[in-house]
Design a protein with these regions (language model features):
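A nucleotide-sugar donor-handling region in carbohydrate enzymes
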Residues: 111-120, 172, 178-225
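Aromatic- and Gly/Pro-rich donor/ligand-binding loops
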Residues: 1-175, 216, 224-225
Length: 225
């Protein structure tokens, strides 16, 4: 069994974020002692101190996958605002609907530059081979962290598309006024097998409005406490 953890914070410098990652890793190790547990990280050595035995997955690959422009930054810079935004949406659509094609484009770009994107391959292999996706504790599904949240939600959908169970631990949901974030969350979160919340006052109602079933939501508190 292979479990992939998306910790949201990839440098592991924030004490609270690091504690939530440690708790998630420890619980998974106790439940599945034979599993291979991978963690997306910018700091493999720090990860090894926090979670001995965890396999690092390069966050650089994650960053390239979600941020790299298939038609090149130079073209984006030359386009006027609306055209640039439209091209960006088209590239995002390619990644979401046809990830194999998007991967091929990135690998071709890397080969032409003679810098094959090893990190992208390792990241996508981890996503494609995992038997479960776990999103670590965070208060990221909210307007101030919308760019990060949208990438996490896309990961949730990618796993769900493969029939892989998804669990989100220690989540703070909302407030959300950003329309793109709301639609992204409403598309992804109902597909999760479990969403554990930090609090029970606002989060359950927000999730219910998004179409998340009550039997998939638990109020567990903050994993760092």
């Amino acid at each position: 069994m292979r479990i992939l953890i998306e910790p949201n914070a990839h440098h592991h410098l924030n004490a609270g974020d690091a504690a939530m990652l440690q708790v998630a890793f420890r619980r998974l190790r106790e439940l599945f002692p034979e599993a291979v547990i991978q963690v997306i990280t910018e700091a493999p050595e720090r990860l090894d101190r926090l979670c001995p035995g965890a396999e690092p997955v390069p966050a650089a690959g994650r960053r390239i996958w979600f941020n790299d422009r298939y038609f090149g930054d130079r073209l984006h810079r030359r386009l006027p605002g609306r055209a640039r935004a439209a091209l960006g949406r088209a590239e995002d659509g390619l990644r979401r609907r046809w990830p194999a094609a998007a991967r091929a484009v990135l690998e071709t770009k890397g080969a032409l530059k003679r810098t094959p994107p090893r990190e992208v391959r390792e990241f996508l292999d981890a996503v494609g081979d995992c038997d479960a996706l776990v999103v670590g504790g965070a208060g990221a599904v909210t307007d101030p962290f919308a760019p990060l949240a949208l990438t996490v939600l896309e990961l949730v959908e990618t796993a769900a598309d493969r029939g892989v169970p998804v669990a989100l631990f220690g989540q703070g949901i909302g407030p959300i006024e950003d329309r793109e974030l709301w639609h992204g969350a409403a598309a992804a979160l109902p597909r999760a097998s479990l969403i554990a919340l930090r609090e029970g006052r606002a989060g359950p109602g927000i999730l219910r409005t998004m179409g998340v079933r009550d039997d998939r939501v638990e109020v567990t508190g903050d994993d760092a406490l």
